[in-house]
A protein has these predicted regions:
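TPR/Sel1-like alpha-solenoid repeat signature
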Residues: 189-196, 215, 229-243, 257, ...
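Short coil/turn connectors between adjacent alpha-helices in alpha-solenoid helical repeat scaffolds
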Residues: 145-163, 197-211, 243-260
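TPR-adjacent "capping" and linker segments in tetratricopeptide-repeat scaffold/adaptor proteins
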Residues: 8-13, 117-162, 170-191, 226
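Hydrophobic, helix-forming membrane-interacting segments
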Residues: 1-2
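Short beta-strand->alpha-helix linker/helix-N-cap micro-motif
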Residues: 7-76, 86-97
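Flexible helix-coil transition and linker loops at the boundaries of alpha-helical arrays
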Residues: 125-130, 167-186, 202-203, 217-235, ...
């Protein structure tokens, strides 16, 4: 095992990123959003709020004709609450799909690697029965939240890197891929890839590159479990981002990384 790298010097910054979790779009009586908010409320570096104002959430089906309604409504809530991240939840049969929205997600440069279309699925049974989540799933959701944060100041970037390092240390001890049944595999591996990419994209380390690539490749190997082609496109897009980052921070083989970026962006 590789020795743990020292944590970035962020512990004294005392920066909390604000997360707003909406009540989930659900056709059964449950409190999914409230459950996730409760489970994330004690996480370091996050300030959690629960948003349960009633409004139609039909746009959460991710159909292209309603996508702009989703973006606009989310931006309105972000503006009202001053949140760094908005978490949506939507029931699909026996699963809950989580999506993560940030301010001006498709307008600003240097945003996080997380797309609004990136979907993390969790068993609906956990929220229906208000159960505590397995520790590995808890850590995965926490890592997804930290990865989603857009950071523009030096202090915020240091804090994000510090929190990512701590959650990766936890995830490396979890067996996240086996926490949920096989049907969740591509979504778990995609978010593990995003979390590691968010931390390591500017490290210039060949080993980190291979770790992240392997996570996304594993997600793609299980593409037969992906029902919506949008989700597969997200994975290829992140592979493109990985190669794109390598062209900037790993100067040994820029042409090869550049080709990899183009191929994966095209596939997405």
């Amino acid at each position: 095992a590789r020795p743990a790298a020292p944590l970035p010097p962020a512990a004294g910054l005392n920066i909390n990123f604000k997360v707003v979790i909406t009540e989930f779009a659900d056709n059964v009586e449950s409190s999914g959003g409230e459950t996730v908010a409760r489970l994330m409320s004690d996480k370091e570096g996050l300030s959690i709020a629960y948003f349960d104002e009633p409004f139609s959430k039909t746009f959460l089906n991710l159909e292209s004709r309603t996508l702009f309604d989703l973006i606009d409504k989310g931006q309105t809530i972000l503006d009202r609450t001053g949140a760094d991240i908005l978490v949506w939840g939507y029931r699909e049969t026996d699963r809950i799909r989580l999506n993560f929205q940030t301010e001006k997600q498709y307008e600003k440069e240097d945003c996080s690697f997380v797309s609004l279309m990136d979907s993390l699925y969790i068993p609906a049974e956990l929220t229906d029965r208000r159960l505590d989540f397995p520790a590995a799933l808890n850590n995965l959701i926490y890592g997804a939240l930290i990865s989603s944060i857009n950071v523009f100041s030096k202090e915020a970037k240091i804090q994000k890197k510090y929190l990512l390092k701590k959650v990766i240390d936890k995830l490396s001890r979890d067996n996240s891929a086996k926490t949920l049944s096989i049907e969740y595999m591509p979504y778990v591996m995609n978010f593990l890839g995003i979390i590691y990419l968010s931390y390591a994209h500017d490290n210039g380390d060949e080993k980190d590159f291979k770790i992240v690539k392997n996570l996304f490749d594993t997600a793609i190997k299980h593409q037969d479990l992906i029902k919506n082609p949008i989700h597969l496109g997200c994975i290829y897009y992140h592979l493109g981002q990985l190669y794109d980052s390598a062209t900037q921070y790993m100067p040994r083989r820029p042409a090869a990384y550049f080709r990899g970026a183009i191929e994966n962006y095209r596939q997405a």
